Amino acid sequence: MDDSREWIRIGAAAQRAGMSVKTVRFYSDEGLIPTAGRTEGGYRLYHQQVVEELHLIQNLRGLGLALSTIRSYLAAKRQGACHCEQLKQSMREQQQAIHQKVAALQNLQQELNETMQGWVNCGGRLDAKLV
């Protein structure tokens, strides 16, 4: 480690990224971010640049992308390769999955509306048909 000012402990990385130490440790254990080593006290050390990667991971997770997709993208990015097309394809697949979920929720909403409409004249009877 050439310059100690470039390396930060896990707590500092977590704080700068706005996430818990547990989350940073998880991402590290899952191979999403590289660990530079450990202090004499056993704390994990990271390059300051990892904070940017943690923000990126957080954003991509927020879009619903799988950790495996994010891991592949970050590995390629670190090697200077562009996997934008692969990432865009994953995002298109996520869009399709969201579209299907929205359609299913709209169907459920319609079923709820129809069921409640059937109760308009139930008169508070316990024997009213529920479905």
Language-model segments: which ranges?
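C-terminal regulatory/oligomerization modules of transcriptional regulators
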Residues: 1-4, 81-131
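Basic helix-turn-helix/winged-helix DNA-binding cores
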Residues: 1-75
